[in-house]
Amino acid sequence: MATIPGSPTSPNATHPLQGDELEPGLLYAVLTYRGELASWNWTFFVPNPAVTPIGSSGTSFHVVDNAVGGWKFEMEVKDVVSSPHVVAIVRLANVSFLGDYEDIVGTDSLLPMFQSVAIPPAGSAGVTDFSSRTWFLDAIYVLHDCCVVQCDDVWMLEREIRRCAFTAMDKYLQNSGASEPPSDLSLDLISCRRLDGIPI
């Protein structure tokens, strides 16, 4: 099992991100605040290494709900390191073997994998239980089957990511007593990273 150079060596643990930027060639999970302490939007993110600090621009892959009760897949450029709504950033895998940044986020790499994850049509029975979290977890299965992410237990990964988010929110609330994240949350306060290559 390979680990990323400079990563802590303790398996099955999350560790604070070092510095104020992400690492190139990695796939991250990003949770953003939705206005409730235990409710987050779940997103995949690949940072663009050409823009510094790394993480201030990159491609996010996620689903969003629309006004008519349906869901749709979106791919968009985002800044996660300075976003006031980011609660947790968790490293999932080194995806540099897929090529450079444009290759990784392009039409022949991660994009078709994410697009293959089923989204229930508006008005169907499955739409009531569907969320960005359930889509994210289904996408982890696809990424695992395609040998992009090594994850033997998706539910354990979900618990670990949620733990990071709860820890970040608790730490923030203890420090300020406010009911929502401030606009200047620092990356080392709110973020955790996971060793890649560790079966979960």
Predicted regions and their residues:
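Non-catalytic ligand/cofactor/substrate-binding and regulatory segments of enzyme domains
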Residues: 2-130
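Activation targets extended, charge/polar-rich intrinsically disordered C-terminal tails
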Residues: 115-200
